[in-house]
Amino acid sequence: MKEDVAEMEKKETKCPECGSTKLINDHERGEVVCGACGLVIDDNIVDMGPEWRAFDHEQRDKRTRVGAPITYTIHDKGLSTMIDWRNKDIYGRDIPARNRAQWYRLRKWQRKIRISGATERNLAFALSELDRDSSRLGLPRSVRESASVVYRNAVENKLIRGRSIEGVVAASLYAACRRCKVPRTLDEIADVSRVSKKEVGRTYRFLTRELHIRLPPTSPIDYVPRFASELNLSGVVQSKAIEIINQAMDNGLTSGRGPTGVAAAALYIASVLLGERKTQRDVADIAGVTEVTIRNRYKELTEQLDMGVNL
């Protein structure tokens, strides 16, 4: 194999017909063509590069297969190694008893080296907390990555001092949910993060102000798929609810209204119209609002949009 590669490297760098050194490598056709006379010098060149394409540095890191991709959800970005707790070598054979004490010491020092400093200890604890909260909320990996970046930026800008790690993690998670359009309410974030809703909201406003994070208001439409899924409503009902919300937005009926309440009322109306009726209590429990809120939003939407729906 080495001889073949060496032979390929020694191939002529000029056209044997006209002597021109202006050679063109056409990788799509697998040919080397003379740019002067058009002679096809080689019609079977091999592309030694990867079979994938990457359009930026981050994509390249993720697609290369010479190691795990960089991730912001681990304090060292996944770049370090660790010694496995099982006392086996790379072939699966047990390590001799006389060497196990040495492996124990190596494993101990490896753990210390991976987390060597106050900042890394902070990140290690915070990111494990973030992973726990994300798992309980069922959030996708993209949200976890985004939340990890927000938290890291807060650490770099020294915004953690005087605030609880749990509170900053919860606020970062809330910001990431809004950025990725995977909405979760402050109540849901507070329930899993062991901090109050008030602290999460206050820390979120502080981070967005200090880190100059600009996030658009949450749309009621973003809540429809999740609420509909939990209520076992069909896709037709979801589409109808989104249609109702769009009409409400066009008529300015969502201004100053909580997005969860509007989404819940629209789903309730759509379920009644299409014969998949759910009780107000069921919808209210899923949306995290009161039945009174649903009735108020229901009344506004049906009257202003001229819908003939009976409770």
Swiss-Prot record:
Belongs to the TFIIB family. NCBIfam families: PRK00423.1. The keyword Transcription regulation applies. Stabilizes TBP binding to an archaeal box-A promoter. Also responsible for recruiting RNA polymerase II to the pre-initiation complex (DNA-TBP-TFIIB). It comes from Methanosphaera stadtmanae (strain ATCC 43021 / DSM 3091 / JCM 11832 / MCB-3). Coiled coil: none annotated. GO terms for cellular component: transcription preinitiation complex. It comes from the Archaea. The gene is tfb. PROSITE patterns: TFIIB, ZF_TFIIB. One of its GO terms (biological process) is transcription preinitiation complex assembly. A zinc finger (TFIIB-type) spans 11-42. Transmembrane segments: none annotated. Keywords: Metal-binding, Repeat, Transcription, Transcription regulation, Zinc, Zinc-finger. GO terms for molecular function: DNA-binding transcription factor activity; TBP-class protein binding; zinc ion binding. Zn(2+) binds at C15, C18, C34, C37. InterPro entries: Cyclin-like_dom, Cyclin-like_sf, TFIIB, TFIIB_arc, TFIIB_CS, TFIIB_cyclin, Znf_TFIIB. Sequence repeats lie at residues 128-211, 222-303. This is Transcription initiation factor IIB.
